[in-house]
Swiss-Prot record:
Keywords associated with the record: Antioxidant, Cytoplasm, Disulfide bond, Oxidoreductase, Peroxidase, Redox-active center
Protein name: Peroxiredoxin
An example Gene Ontology molecular-function term: peroxidase activity
Superkingdom, taxonomy of origin: Bacteria
UniProt cross-references to Pfam families, sorted A to Z: 1-cysPrx_C, AhpC-TSA
GO biological process, one term: cell redox homeostasis
Organism, as annotated: Thermotoga maritima (strain ATCC 43589 / DSM 3109 / JCM 10099 / NBRC 100826 / MSB8)
Length: 215
């Protein structure tokens, strides 16, 4: 259904887009890499400007995680270019990641980025997509609230750690109030496994269903 929000665990819809770096096909052009697609309401607006600067300041950290950034709004490509030039000239920050020019709003509608009572501008959405093109996380912010880049980076790191180690990630990781930077071991699936887990020196446990370890 047009406008339906794609779901976590689904493949990111295949879309051909025009960007400030030329034409691209998502998710195909990012196969083998993670990518974060984030939409913003409009160019030449204060909150969006702070977000773009914040994303750029952390761009190297994303790339060290094999993760690319790509922005999107319902603006024409020349508007993106002029805004990026303004950011470089006035703020001394060069935006290095591509920005999708969705001037007709077709991609935004397909991804469910236009919400009721918000006109034709997109909300502040974040899609985290893995190297296989699967959507792993979706976050929506209202137009009035800028995003926290630390949390987006944390989510990417957490998903990658979960995939690599087969573990779950606690709240506020890696500074959790109970287990600090440890990760949660999946619960035991049998009585015998639960007993062995409590006796194991590989984990620390509050109980058989709540065990954790360092990674």
């Amino acid at each position: 259904m047009e406008g339906r929000i794609p779901l976590i665990g689904e493949e990111f819809p295949r879309v051909e887009v025009k960007t400030t770096h030329g034409k691209k096909v998502l998710p195909d052009d990012f196969r083998g890499k993670w990518f974060v697609l984030f939409s913003h309401p409009a160019d030449f607006t204060p909150v969006c400007t702070t977000e773009f600067v914040a994303f750029q300041k952390r761009y190297d950290e994303f790339r060290k995680l094999n993760t690319e950034l790509i922005g999107l709004s319902i603006d024409q490509v020349f508007s993106h270019i002029k805004w990026i030039e303004w950011i470089k000239e006035k703020l001394g920050v060069e935006i290095e990641f591509p920005v999708i020019a969705d001037d007709l709003g077709e991609v935004s509608r397909r991804l469910g980025l236009i919400h009721p009572n918000k006109g034709t501008n997109t909300v502040r959405a974040v899609f985290i997509v893995d190297p296989n093109g699967i959507i792993r996380a979706i976050v929506y912010y209202p137009q009035e609230v800028g995003r926290n880049i630390d949390e987006i980076l944390r989510a990417v790191k957490a998903l990658q750690t979960s995939d690599e180690k087969g573990v779950a990630i606690p709240a506020n990781w890696p500074s959790n109030e109970l287990i600090n930077d440890s990760v949660i071991v999946p619960p035991a699936s049998s009585v015998e496994e639960a007993r062995k887990r409590l006796e194991s020196k590989d984990f620390e446990c509050y109980d058989w269903w709540f065990c954790y370890k360092k990674v």
